[in-house]
Swiss-Prot record:
Biased composition (Low complexity): 1-10
Residues covered by the PAS domain: 163-235, 342-412
Its biological purpose: Transcriptional activator which forms a core component of the circadian clock. The circadian clock, an internal time-keeping system, regulates various physiological processes through the generation of approximately 24 hour circadian rhythms in gene expression, which are translated into rhythms in metabolism and behavior. It is derived from the Latin roots 'circa' (about) and 'diem' (day) and acts as an important regulator of a wide array of physiological functions including metabolism, sleep, body temperature, blood pressure, endocrine, immune, cardiovascular, and renal function.
Major place of residence: nucleus
Spans annotated as Disordered: 1-29, 41-86
Protein name: Basic helix-loop-helix ARNT-like protein 2
Induction: Expression in the pineal gland exhibits circadian rhythm. Maximum levels expressed at CT14, and between ZT14 and ZT18.
Name of the gene encoding the protein in the UniProt record: BMAL2
Keyword Transmembrane helix tagged: no
Subunit field text: Component of the circadian core oscillator, which includes the CRY proteins, CLOCK, or NPAS2, BMAL1 or BMAL2, CSNK1D and/or CSNK1E, TIMELESS and the PER proteins. Interacts directly with CLOCK to form the BMAL2-CLOCK transactivator. Can form heterodimers or homodimers which interact directly with CLOCK to form the transcription activator.
Compositional bias annotation for Basic and acidic residues: 77-86
């Protein structure tokens, strides 16, 4: 039995050695790390006892159990090893990810610290700012620079066919101002364009080399200095610390070295004017006692900052000031005169003037009516087309409008009328002011139409009684006459007033014919009359200098009819409306039938309705 026990002990010892050789126990072993509890019964007696017999006795007693455990452990080893390997891979991946995140955080912190050192607003801070505050300050600093590269390079683009002087003249003409260059250190005027004479009435040579601060209003000097010296003139945002929640106060002032080329500038200032300009301002300003307004003009300056080498600008004498910066900083801007706005009276509401546009032919007949006229006058555009504007104007305004009508036909400039009354559709009168100018066809060199920009001065504010009283008061020098009351017409208008414009147009055409060279070269407008032919020559007293006017046959027939009836020679069918004794006196008629007959005879003579030759030209519908 003793030998058998010894033999079994030796067999167990050999099996243990074989297991140790196949699966060494060390720090990197999978079994040692994965199943330490299974190895403890084998390794623990060896480490705690130095006697071989003591080690062999417990193994002898538990020989069968340990054999079974070792057999099971060896049989399930591949699956266990796979789980251990996966566990190690996950552990290694987590360790590598944590190391990567740590390196990224360290790198970001270093970049934030470098950014904080580069931002001027962060330097005066005694404590360390959080990351969010540093980023906000960086954004604010970048906004203050206002794009020094891209916006500045855009200024250099110009068409290749334009020279620098031509481009400068075009810019000054479009801006309606003067160009000037001012140094940022002392405010010295380095350049000013010749157009400054038109605005400030100063000579160009008298301003170059002078200090801009000497011409500024005392209260505007500090503002202009701020624009010339500070690189951050825009209102800053309120910065709040993310950790403490308190507002961060920054006391930072930009030095000359921080002025950035291309930074935009726009400000208003008051500049001293010359004496001749002061005299003009005394008349337009409501309070001439204020000396500041009389001496200074408000100028709107817009431009950008520019860096130049001192040698290019010619400021060698200022090199002592430019020690801290390699380039010379200056402001390039355009100054435009800001118009003076008269203060509005208290209680008044400033409303945009009501306007509408119309077009007339040479004889004053509407050829185009703006749609806005419907809301003002009540007429539809098609109701006014083809009718004369004199038919709707008050009779007391005919003389004034006729003078302006002649003026706009003879001149190419704009003509402004005084206030006149225009009859609306409901019978009331609206006060208008008009601006007339003639449009010439660029191909035929003939007048196409007259454009009229009409502005409402007073709305529908006159009743019928006021209109009658207004019409009953004639102009100065006019003879009081009895007016005809025709049903459907306002009391202020005159029957047959539409021929006034035709008379004026014919008069202007005849004057042009007389003052022109050979008659064959004359090309009168075909809108009013046919080509002239020798017919009848009359002496018209209303034509300047008693010129002789050549009339067409249709006009001659009207004159012959008027000679037989009245024994006088008036202007053909139109003159009675302008002269002082030209009103149709229907009061001599005994009854309404006689007045109506006379009215129809006049309309036939005026419109040519009784001429059978003209009826043949009408295209009758079949």
């Amino acid at each position: 039995m003793a030998e058998a026990g010894v033999g079994s002990a030796e067999g167990a010892e050999e099996e243990r050695r074989a297991v140790e050789e196949n699966f060494p126990v060390d720090g990197n072993s999978c079994i040692a790390s994965g199943v330490p509890s299974l190895m403890n019964p084998i390794t623990k007696p060896a480490t705690t006892s130095f006697n071989n017999s003591v080690v062999e006795i417990p193994r002898k007693r538990k020989g069968s159990d340990s054999d079974n455990q070792d057999t099971v452990e060896v049989d399930g080893d591949p699956q266990k090893r796979n789980e251990d390997e996966e566990h190690l891979k996950i552990k290694d991946f987590r360790e590598a990810h944590s190391q990567t995140e740590k390196r990224r955080r360290d790198k970001m912190n270093n970049l934030i610290e470098e950014l904080s050192a580069m931002i001027p607003q962060c330097n005066p801070m005694a404590r360390k700012l959080d990351k969010l505050t540093v980023l906000r300050m960086a954004v604010q600093h970048l906004k203050s620079l206002k794009g020094s590269t891209s916006s500045y390079t855009e200024v250099r683009y110009k068409p290749s066919f334009l020279k620098d002087d031509e481009l400068r003249q075009l810019i000054l003409r479009a801006a309606d101002g003067f160009l000037f260059v001012v140094g940022c250190n002392r405010g010295k005027i380095l350049f000013v364009s010749e157009s400054v004479c038109k605005i400030l009435n100063y000579d160009q040579t008298s301003l170059i080399g002078q200090s801009l601060f000497d011409y500024l209003h005392p209260k505007d000097v500090a503002k202009v200095k701020e624009q010339l010296s500070s690189s951050d003139v825009s209102p800053r945002e309120k910065l709040v610390d993310g950790k403490t929640g308190l507002q961060v106060h920054t006391d930072f002032q930009a030095g000359p070295a921080r002025l950035n080329s291309g930074a935009r500038r726009s400000f208003f200032c008051r500049i001293k004017c010359s004496r001749t300009t002061v005299k003009e301002e005394k008349e337009c300003l409501p309070n001439p006692k204020k000396k500041d307004h009389r001496k200074y003009c408000t100028i709107h300056c817009t431009g950008y900052m520019k860096n130049w080498p001192p040698s290019e600008v010619g400021v060698e004498e200022e090199n002592d000031v430019e020690k801290n910066s390699s380039n010379f900083n200056c402001l390039v801007a355009i100054g435009r005169l800001h118009p003076y706005i008269v203060p509005q009276k208290s209680g008044e509401i400033k409303v945009k003037a009501t306007e509408f546009v119309t077009r007339f032919a040479m004889d004053g007949k509407f050829v185009y009516v703006d749609q806005r006229a419907t809301a003002i006058l009540g007429y539809l555009p098609q109701e006014l087309l083809g009718t004369s504007c004199y038919e709707y104007c008050h009779q007391d305004d005919h003389n004034h409008l006729a003078e302006k009508h002649k003026e706009v036909l003879q001149n190419k400039e704009k003509v402004f009328t005084n206030s006149y009354k225009f009859r609306a559709k409901d019978g009331s009168f609206i006060t208008l002011k008009s601006q007339w100018f003639s449009f010439m066809n660029p191909w035929t060199k003939e007048l196409e139409y007259i454009v009229s920009n009409n502005t409402v001065v007073l709305g529908h504010n006159e009743s019928a009684e006021e209109q009658v009283s207004y019409g009953s008061q004639p102009a100065e020098g006019a003879v009081k006459q009895s007016l005809v009351s025709v049903p459907g017409m306002s009391s202020g208008t005159v029957l047959g007033a539409g021929s006034i414009g035709t008379e004026i147009a014919n008069e202007i055409l005849e004057l042009q014919r007389l003052h022109s060279s050979p008659p064959g070269e004359l090309s009168p407008s075909h809108l009013l009359r046919k080509s002239p032919s020798p017919a009848l020559t009359v002496n018209c007293s209303n034509v300047p200098n008693k010129e002789l006017i050549q009339l067409c046959p249709s006009e001659a027939e009207v004159l012959e009819t008027s000679e037989q009836n009245q024994g006088a020679i008036p202007f053909p069918s139109n003159e009675p409306l302008l002269g002082g004794n030209s009103q149709l006196d229907f009061a001599i008629c005994e009854n309404d039938d006689t007045a109506m007959t006379a009215l129809m005879n006049y309309l036939e003579a005026d419109g040519g309705l009784g001429d059978p030759a003209e009826l043949s030209d009408i295209q009758w519908a079949l």
